[in-house]
């Protein structure tokens, strides 16, 4: 009988990536197949997030729902992972003693051993240590599910913004070796992946070691990923403005695989609030970076993160944020009302902005973003957009759906052979969360890929011999 695994995931794309790795790992080591519901599972894992308010209580409410499953099936294994597990540790077992496993983001690779310990008679296993990058050495080959895929290139953050728990739950910045990242991308490309999304809590701070010990910057990594055959689009998240350096901006001029979309969290448009948050930059510095980038990519679309009602935020501070939103012309935001995270420096500040004011400001901000997004979408009508076809439309399974470079969902009539490839679409209509279009051409008509025999490539190269008589390969320009 097939053993079943159910994973419930809360939080960021890194958590989604981690959950997929857990599933792949337990499939390869124990043969567990993913279940659709917790009721049919032999193992239940909750991958948690500590960013939102009352994250801990949300975890215990969910565990309470699963308690009866454990009573009905005593051999059921229940595990809690992610950032809340890293924060709470032993407290989870104290409040929910029926939980078998507690593991942090950096120890998910040890799940097979933990499960074996429970099956061997251990009452519980708790491992919330920070073994840095070890987890990537123990994970199986990636499995592609469609033409897009996430690839984690680093873990943790060393910025210590005053509101953020990430350095305490995922540790400080640790970058994966370059060769490991490139191998994972190449393996995904072999399985038909056309777009990769490079992940990290502070992804553009990547400083990955080469096999010879030299350090690779994020801009250099982008160039190498773009050179992998089959990869036609590159996205990345989440970035920090301080690490969004000129070499990354310049990469947009030379790497066409980098999409015309950037998510760059700013949190506030007020220098005073940015200083309280310990963000390390001003609003004008943020604007300057984006203006440089838009000189290279005039059609760039922008999204960002905002915290509303940070301690001490005045009406003037909020207006500065609204001015920044208008100046940068953001068309998407992830905006949250501030709530203190236990253990962070900001938790010691007086939370002096009323809930009513926070909600009013949040509504104003979201309305501004929505208006800008609708205007930008309407300007796309009659334009031609290249769309990566991801599969059937969620709204109408008889249609197909995909994304433009600027991250807009487009629904259109098409044929199954288009899935996994590119189509050029004329945008005909705009809806609240999507666009509609008509297919103009398929990938076969785009000349995206030109197959050239190795002999033809070599024939174009020039070989130069140095003073020692050693031939040096020099690519032709």
From Swiss-Prot:
**What reaction gets catalysed by this protein?**
N(6)-dimethylallyladenosine(37) in tRNA + (sulfur carrier)-SH + AH2 + 2 S-adenosyl-L-methionine = 2-methylsulfanyl-N(6)-dimethylallyladenosine(37) in tRNA + (sulfur carrier)-H + 5'-deoxyadenosine + L-methionine + A + S-adenosyl-L-homocysteine + 2 H(+)
- The MTTase N-terminal domain is annotated at 3-120
Supply the InterPro entries for this chain: Elp3/MiaA/NifB-like_rSAM (IPR006638), Methylthiotransferase (IPR005839), Methylthiotransferase_CS (IPR020612), Methylthiotransferase_N (IPR013848), Methylthiotransferase_N_sf (IPR038135), MiaB_methiolase (IPR006463), rSAM (IPR007197), rSAM_horseshoe (IPR023404)
Query: What NCBIfam families would the database entry show?
Result: miaB-methiolase, MiaB/RimO family radical SAM methylthiotransferase
Which purpose does this protein serve, as stated in its record?
Catalyzes the methylthiolation of N6-(dimethylallyl)adenosine (i(6)A), leading to the formation of 2-methylthio-N6-(dimethylallyl)adenosine (ms(2)i(6)A) at position 37 in tRNAs that read codons beginning with uridine.
Q: Which protein are we looking at?
A: tRNA-2-methylthio-N(6)-dimethylallyladenosine synthase
Per the UniProt record, the source organism is Pseudoalteromonas atlantica (strain T6c / ATCC BAA-1087)
Q: Which family does it belong to?
A: Belongs to the methylthiotransferase family. MiaB subfamily.
Q: Tell me where in or outside the cell this protein is found.
A: Cytoplasm
- Please provide an example of a Pfam family that matches this protein in its UniProt record: UPF0004
């Amino acid at each position: 009988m097939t053993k079943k695994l159910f994973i419930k995931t809360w939080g960021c794309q890194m958590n989604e990536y981690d959950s997929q790795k857990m599933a792949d790992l337990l499939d390869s080591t124990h043969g567990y197949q993913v279940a659709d519901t917790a009721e049919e599972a032999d193992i239940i894992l909750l991958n948690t997030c500590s960013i939102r308010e009352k994250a801990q209580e949300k975890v215990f409410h969910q565990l309470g729902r699963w308690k009866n499953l454990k009573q009905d099936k005593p051999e059921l294994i229940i595990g809690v992972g992610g950032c809340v597990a890293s924060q709470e540790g032993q407290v989870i077992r104290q409040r929910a003693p029926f939980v078998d496993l507690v593991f942090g983001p950096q120890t998910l690779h040890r799940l097979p051993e933990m499960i074996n310990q429970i099956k061997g008679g251990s009452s519980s296993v708790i491992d919330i240590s920070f073994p840095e990058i070890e987890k990537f050495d123990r994970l199986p080959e990636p499995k592609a599910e469609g033409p897009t895929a996430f690839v984690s290139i680093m873990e943790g953050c060393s910025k210590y913004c005053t509101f953020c728990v990430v350095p305490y739950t995922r540790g400080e910045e640790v970058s994966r070796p370059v060769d490991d990242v490139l191998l994972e991308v190449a393996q995904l490309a072999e399985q038909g992946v056309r777009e990769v999304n490079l992940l990290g809590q502070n992804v553009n701070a990547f400083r990955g070691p080469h096999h010879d010990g030299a350090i690779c910057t994020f801009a250099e990594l982008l160039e190498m990923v773009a050179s992998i055959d089959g990869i036609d689009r590159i996205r990345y998240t989440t970035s920090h403005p301080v690490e969004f350096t000129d070499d990354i901006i310049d990469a947009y001029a030379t790497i066409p695989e980098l999409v015309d979309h950037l998510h760059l969290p700013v949190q506030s448009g007020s220098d005073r609030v940015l200083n309280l948050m310990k963000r390390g930059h001003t609003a004008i510095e943020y604007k300057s970076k984006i203006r440089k980038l838009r000189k290279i990519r005039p059609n760039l679309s922008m999204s960002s993160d905002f915290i509303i009602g940070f301690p001490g935020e005045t009406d003037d501070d909020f207006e500065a944020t609204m001015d920044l939103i208008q100046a940068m012309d953001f068309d998407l935001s992830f905006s949250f009302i501030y709530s203190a995270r236990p253990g962070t420096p900001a938790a010691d500040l007086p939370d002096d902005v009323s809930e009513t004011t926070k909600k009013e400001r949040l509504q104003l901000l979201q309305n501004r973003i929505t208006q800008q997004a609708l205007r930008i979408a309407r300007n796309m009508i009659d334009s031609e957009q290249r769309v990566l076809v991801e599969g059937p439309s969620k709204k109408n399974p008889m249609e197909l759906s995909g994304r433009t470079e600027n991250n807009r969902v487009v629904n259109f009539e098409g044929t199954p052979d288009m899935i996994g490839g590119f189509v050029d679409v004329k945008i005909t209509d705009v809806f609240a969360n999507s666009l509609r279009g008509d297919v103009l051409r398929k990938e076969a008509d785009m000349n995206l890929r030109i197959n050239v025999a190795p002999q033809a490539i070599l024939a174009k190269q020039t070989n130069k011999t140095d003073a020692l008589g050693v031939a040096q390969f020099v690519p032709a320009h």
